[in-house]
């Protein structure tokens, strides 16, 4: 009986898949898809996408099949993967509006009010209005400048907390959680107002974000194979996302006051008469895109500095030369430190926080390299592959901040070409809305921590691990644990 049931189930699955394939075949046959690895029935190229991280696998496949190739996630869900800067520029910049649609797993509807936020919604009046409201209000330059003293206060408190924690653990600690919560505080003031001071909220958002990252790794299989929606593992993921979303609602709802300060994101959201669901989704999005992109990138940078003491001391000297050792580094100093900027860029080159960017979808019939691309075609840009092109970045797997310093071009490559090929925040009309704030907070955090502490291996002679976690964003498999020594004690 059980064997018969298994046969019936398998037959239904195969028939369903073939029916879907036949249904889709008419829509995809009118377009000449770029060549790619040979696909198998039903599963497409899924058998070739395991093992290493997704962006690494695709970068290796591009070396064989070309920098513009088609990958089939399931036999009826093709996507074009671009691993070349010129083609990426055509998609992201030159034909930005043609490729400005989005392609997200169904599960993301739960936390985005049915894709009603900046990152998930297709381009159009709603998207333009929401993006303009964020950038022109909470993230307006003068409003960000008004945060400088509070950022510096937060950093002073963070350094004190880190020193106290490390002193109880033989000088060793993990910096990631400290930097995440520092970023949550900054973003909360921009969303709700400068009077924000709720550590329970900070801890709650931190936990919710960690849970969403953990769950995100299971999100896409059911999009490739709809019958997977009934698998217990997928149902569990759906249930967990609903639970996290409910926790976020309970955290944010008490802050949905009628008259928030005029320079906050909440003021703009209220002015648009959005539902609470859309407002909470927009608030969560700021944390979701802003916290890990800032904190995790700073920790990647610290990891490289532990592994490269020469670079760390060169950066420390630049900071002290600017401050004279008479004061702490300030937020406004970030733009005055060229080697700091080079370290930041080299970290984002080697470890872009979104190595496959956010998936794009064509909003109309268009073209790529002169060939027709149908409306609704999924596009992914492999930023990791672009950032590791040896023709642009000599010795691409080595951490060399000097490549981004003016005057070093002859030794490390064409700096103009390298700058154009560096796309950690994507490019074009869908470039990250919070890019400038993210770079500022990232740079200030990194400079402050290098100024305050000397960072060394937690265990003498054992360099920190650079392994990557296999998820949508580029996190460390084993977050940095390092020994910190206050510079005042050296």
Swiss-Prot record:
GO terms of biological process kind: isoquinoline alkaloid biosynthetic process
Gene: CYP719A5
Binding site for heme: 432
Tissue specificity as recorded in UniProt: Expressed in roots. Detected in leaves and stems.
Intracellular or extracellular location(s): Endoplasmic reticulum membrane
EC class: oxidoreductase
Protein name, UniProt field: Cheilanthifoline synthase
GO cellular component terms listed in the entry, alphabetical order: endoplasmic reticulum membrane
Top-level taxon of the source organism: Eukaryota
Primary residence: endoplasmic reticulum
Family that this chain belongs to: Belongs to the cytochrome P450 family.
């Amino acid at each position: 009986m059980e064997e018969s049931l298994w046969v019936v189930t398998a037959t239904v699955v195969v028939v369903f898949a073939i029916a879907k394939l036949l249904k889709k075949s008419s829509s995809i046959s009118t377009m000449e898809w770029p060549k790619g690895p040979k696909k198998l029935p039903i599963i497409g190229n899924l058998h070739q996408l395991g093992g290493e991280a997704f962006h690494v696998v695709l970068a290796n496949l591009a070396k064989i099949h070309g920098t513009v190739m088609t990958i089939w996630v399931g036999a009826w869900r093709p996507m074009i993967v671009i691993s070349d800067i010129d083609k990426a520029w055509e998609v992201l910049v030159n034909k930005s509006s043609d490729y400005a649609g989005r392609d997200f797993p169904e599960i993301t509807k739960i936390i985005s009010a049915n894709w009603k936020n900046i990152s998930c919604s297709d381009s159009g009046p709603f998207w333009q209005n929401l993006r303009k409201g964020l950038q022109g209000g909470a993230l307006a330059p003068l409003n960000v400048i008004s945060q400088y003293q509070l950022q510096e206060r937060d950093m002073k408190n963070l350094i004190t907390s880190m020193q106290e924690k490390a002193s109880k653990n033989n000088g060793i600690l993990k910096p990631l959680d400290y930097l995440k919560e520092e970023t949550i505080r900054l973003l909360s003031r921009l969303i709700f107002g400068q009077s924000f001071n709720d550590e329970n909220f900070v801890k709650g958002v931190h936990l919710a974000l960690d849970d969403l990252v953990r769950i995100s790794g299971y999100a896409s299989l059911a999009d490739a194979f709809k019958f997977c929606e009934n698998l217990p593992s997928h149902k569990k993921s759906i249930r967990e996302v609903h639970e996290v979303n409910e926790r976020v609602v309970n955290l944010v709802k008490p802050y949905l006051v009628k008259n928030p300060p005029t320079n906050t994101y909440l003021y703009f959201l209220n002015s648009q008469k959005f539902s609470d669901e859309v407002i909470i989704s927009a608030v969560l999005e700021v944390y979701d895109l802003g916290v890990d992109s800032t904190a995790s990138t700073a920790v990647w940078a610290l990891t490289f500095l532990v592994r490269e003491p020469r670079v760390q001391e060169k950066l420390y000297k630049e900071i002290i030369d600017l401050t004279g050792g008479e004061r702490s580094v300030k937020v406004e100093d970030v733009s005055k430190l060229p080697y700091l900027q080079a370290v930041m860029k080299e970290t984002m080159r080697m470890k872009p926080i979104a190595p496959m960017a956010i998936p794009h979808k064509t909003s109309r019939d268009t073209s790529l390299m002169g060939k027709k691309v149908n409306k609704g075609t999924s596009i992914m840009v492999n930023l990791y592959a672009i950032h590791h092109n040896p023709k642009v970045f000599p010795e691409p797997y080595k951490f060399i901040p000097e490549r981004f310093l003016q005057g070093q071009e002859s030794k490390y490559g064409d700096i103009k070409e390298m700058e154009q090929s560096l796309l950690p925040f994507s490019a074009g009309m869908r470039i990250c809305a919070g890019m400038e704030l993210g770079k500022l907070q990232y740079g200030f955090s990194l400079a402050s921590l290098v100024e305050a502490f000397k960072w060394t291996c937690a265990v003498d002679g054992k360099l920190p691990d650079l392994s990557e976690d296999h998820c949508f964003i580029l996190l460390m498999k084993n977050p940095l644990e390092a020994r910190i020594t206050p510079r005042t004690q050296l």
